[in-house]
Amino acid sequence: YNPFNGKYLIEEYDIRVVNSARDFIQNKEKEQIQYTINTAVLFGYPNFDGNSSFSSDTAVLFALNRDLSSFWIDSLTRGGLKVNPLPGTKKEINNISHTLNSNGWNINSYTENDATESNLKKISSPRVLHIASHGYFFSDIPQTTENNRFLGMDRNQVIQDPMLRSGLIFAGANRTLRGEKSTGENGLLSAAEASLLDLRETELVILSACETGRGEETNSEGVYGLRKAFLDAGAQNIIMSLWKVDDNVTQEFMSRFYEIWLHDKTTIREAFNRTQLDIKEKYPQPYYWGAFLLIEK
């Protein structure tokens, strides 16, 4: 914010964010990818309570004690005491799907019981990957004397690896948090897992979830967390958030971004900057528009 003229930086400068100084240097040398097939994969409105892979007679993958479950539930939501549905993301996915379809894109949408971690891991380099769900980041691991496990792993391992302390939440996650047993994925995608996705030819990843842009800073590699994970997986650009944002405003932001990018045929950065300014006109407080971040590789 510039106190001399009452304007914010985004109103005066074309701001560019990279994950690290190394990425900034490498970006000058990289060749631009030519995208010939417009494909998009959309995830949203997961059914956090439902997933057919859960059963009562299989091994426990993620056994959480009551104290840790309470900590998770409080930390993973946008404002409640449990992982609640995100009705705004259903409208968000529908609107984006309509916009993409009207511009000739091939779309695969996964919602409710289909918005699973396992379906995400099957994707292969779509041009756009959009995930509208809860995100999380643990800056501090809660202490407990009951056992030395956190998220089913040795606590010391989690503390030492920040890639295990941030992630996204998919269908069935509540059942994992309650300590139920699973035959497959648990609905909790860590940054470490996200880094293994096949996004080698993906132009844009949008993480429409709270706190997805946070991570642990290091001297040489920028921020360890979901932003680093998706860049490592191959994504060229990432749009994510730094704090909890109103569901409806998030939906408006994302829908407006796609409209500008596809209809006006702008660059991703120009579409993002214009979207921020448009949202700022309707919601002047930085809380609403300042949370969103574009990271370029």
Show the residue positions of the predicted features.
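Catalytic cores of enzymes
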Residues: 1-297
